[in-house]
UniProtKB/Swiss-Prot annotation:
Mg(2+) binds at residues 10, 381. It holds the Pfam family Acetate_kinase. This is Acetate kinase. The gene is ackA. The active site is at 144 (proton donor/acceptor). Catalyzes the formation of acetyl phosphate from acetate and ATP. Can also catalyze the reverse reaction. Keywords: ATP-binding, Cytoplasm, Kinase, Magnesium, Metal-binding, Nucleotide-binding, Transferase. It comes from the Bacteria. The lineage of its organism: Bacteria, Pseudomonadati, Pseudomonadota, Gammaproteobacteria, Pseudomonadales. Pathway: Metabolic intermediate biosynthesis; acetyl-CoA biosynthesis; acetyl-CoA from acetate: step 1/2. It comes from Stutzerimonas stutzeri (strain A1501) (Pseudomonas stutzeri). One of its GO terms (biological process) is acetate metabolic process. CDD domains: ASKHA_NBD_AcK_PK (cd24010). GO terms for cellular component: cytosol.
């Protein structure tokens, strides 16, 4: 049987990230990004071995953009596409694994819109567009939240009145589940440790950041909660703040909920602390030049990350390793070094040369001799979504 091809789609409100995944190839035959969807500036960027190309598609909606993308995908797949895997942000309590998409499962995704009002409608737009364009192809939903459905109740419940959970689903769900699942399994493979007898601390650090405790291939706790705002300091998100901050800002400054929500999600984090940028690469340069805001943002980011990792360790029976992934986790040797300096009780020590070497997609162990294992493992959510899609096709 020839190697199969899966198209992976990640739809945002005004964007579509896509990748063609061939099960036998390490690199993607075609990938790209459609951005500014619905506006006169809408454009699709394609990238393949042949090079890069951008195509303007003024005012295209999700379906019109996908109609431009899919013929190129089919061509790159040699005319044979086997299925489509969709990233879906929120599966609530209904979806604890990836699932084939049909009328029933689509209704379940729609029922969770109140839990992800920005993301799930965008995900559904992409799903409906793909189904309209390729009604005969099997399509699969892969949920950011599904991996964390194995968390015990004492880890996912908030200490608020029970009725809020039972009637309104107010609980911790966690996100980045596809990345945490892929990376923890890959770490076990690289370390030669059985997945079903392993315990990992995973730090997914990008513009969004979260930690996760993974035991025997299952999530036992994670730093994000009801929404992706809970937990670590992120690019533009505050992470944990005093819940009374909303009341304080309303009474003191007269801010309404929408303004506070926008500030915490889009104006805070590294951007808010530094007054400069949400990009750790920009802050790294500014920090070297002595920019006070960049120095502060870096220090708060690393300390809060270390604090979260220490908290996640409560869910582990043992520690087989700490794993860094995501754009910052994979590329910032300085963040890794500073974070571990805050975790002295764990006995972590880095091999400076190995730490410096593991950037730009290089995986490996970076601990010094005698230290607990520390690894850098590049994430690959697109491949994990494709693997889930193939598994359901084989079921």
């Amino acid at each position: 049987m020839s190697a199969r091809n899966i198209l992976v789609i990640n739809c945002g409100s005004s964007s579509i990230k896509f990748a063609l995944v061939n099960e036998a190839q390490a690199t993607f035959p075609l990938q790209g990004l459609a951005e500014c969807i619905g506006s006169p500036e809408a454009v699709i960027h394609f990238e393949s071995a042949a090079g890069k190309e951008s195509v303007k598609v003024p005012n295209a909606d999700h379906q019109a953009a996908l109609a431009q993308i899919l013929p190129r995908v089919e061509d790159a797949a040699g005319g044979h596409l086997d299925g489509i895997g969709h990233r879906v942000v929120h599966g609530g309590e209904k979806f604890f694994a990836s699932t084939l998409l049909n009328d029933e499962t689509l209704a379940g995704i729609e029922a969770n819109i109140q839990l992800a009002p920005l993301h799930n409608p965008a995900n559904l737009s992409g799903i409906h567009a793909a189904i309209n364009l390729f009604p005969e192809l099997p399509q699969v939903g892969v949920f950011d939240t599904a991996f964390h459905q194995t968390m015990p109740e004492h880890a996912y419940r908030y200490a608020v009145p029970d009725v809020l959970y039972k009637d309104h689903g107010v609980r911790r769900y966690g996100f980045h589940g596809t990345s945490h699942r892929y990376v923890s399994k890959r770490a076990a493979e690289l370390a030669g440790v059985p997945v079903d007898n392993s315990s990992w601390l995973v730090a997914h650090l990008g513009n969004g950041c979260s930690t996760c405790a993974v035991v025997n291939g299952e999530s036992r706790d994670t730093s994000m909660g009801l929404t992706p705002l809970e937990g670590l300091v992120m690019g533009t998100r505050s992470g944990d703040v005093d819940p009374s901050l909303h009341n304080f800002l309303h009474k003191t400054l007269g801010w309404d909920l929408a303004k506070i929500d926008n500030m915490l999600n889009k104006e805070s984090g590294l951007k808010g602390l530094s007054g400069l940028s949400n990009d750790m690469r920009t802050l790294a340069e500014a920090r070297q030049a002595g920019h006070p805001g960049a120095v502060l943002a870096f220090e708060v980011f690393c300390y809060r990350l270390a604090k979260s990792l220490a908290a996640m360790s409560c869910a582990l029976p043992q520690l087989d390793g700490l794993v860094f992934t995501g754009g910052i986790g994979e590329n910032s040797s300085a963040v890794r070094e500073r974070t571990l300096e805050h975790l002295k009780l764990f006995g972590f020590k880095l091999d400076a040369e190995a730490n410096a070497r593991c950037t730009r997609g290089v995986a490996g162990e970076i601990q010094a001799q005698g230290s607990p294992r520390v690894m850098v493992v590049p994430t690959n959510e697109e491949r994990q979504i494709a693997l889930d899609t193939l598994a359901l096709l084989d079921a």
